[in-house]
Amino acid sequence: LFHSVTASAADTWSVNPSDYRYDMSLYLNVTFAAGEELDYTQYDVAAFVGDECRGVAEVLPVPGGKDCLYLRARSNRESGETMTFRYRNKTTGEVKDIENVNFAFASNARLGYPSSPYEVKIVIYHDVIISTEGGGSVNESGGRLAEGTSLNLIATPDEGHYFSGWSDGSTENPRPLVVGTEDVAL
């Protein structure tokens, strides 16, 4: 299991509002796919077009409710630009894309409400490498899989060969595997 990280030290997380003609309001609740809330005191969230920052979210206290993020996205096109999200660890500076989540910019539009924010799920993906040595096959090919994905690996030796174990020393076959946060090579 290998973890892929998308990060760029060159990301600029500021926007000059006078550089843009149009804006859009977003009210967001950002969580990890497993249900854990993103700690807004530890992370920034921003909207991007390519590598250009188009808005940085601020924490919006909601009376009697859970805080959400308010983000004012900006554009010079009235509509149609596809914007993506990134989040940044305030302590380490590490930046990651929020993969497979985007929105179409529309001037004066709103996405979500303070009382019902738009849900943004951070799904962490890992490159899962499954290979064979000698003669045989494995029923799963691996690939880029979401954290928490369950696999049931079955090693099938070719005629004249036998299964001796996985590269981590386990001899369980079939072998259940849940894609986690630690690197594992099988």
Regions found by a protein language model. Name each.
Residues 1-3:
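Bacterial N-terminal signal peptides
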Residues 5-125:
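Primarily marks secretory-pathway-exposed extracellular/lumenal segments that are disulfide-
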Residues 45, 85, 130, 136-138, ...:
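Extracellular/surface recognition and adhesion modules
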Residues 58, 74, 141-143, 175-177:
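Beta-strand-rich interaction surfaces with strong enrichment in secreted/lumenal proteins
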Residues 80-82, 148-150, 183:
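Extracellular Ig-like/FN3 beta-sandwich strand-entry sites
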Residues 91, 149-176:
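Surface-exposed interfaces of beta-sheet-rich extracellular modules
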Residues 127-144, 169-172:
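Short, solvent-exposed loop/edge segments of extracellular or virion-exposed proteins
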Residues 146-147, 175-186:
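Solvent-exposed segments in extracellular or luminal domains encompassing
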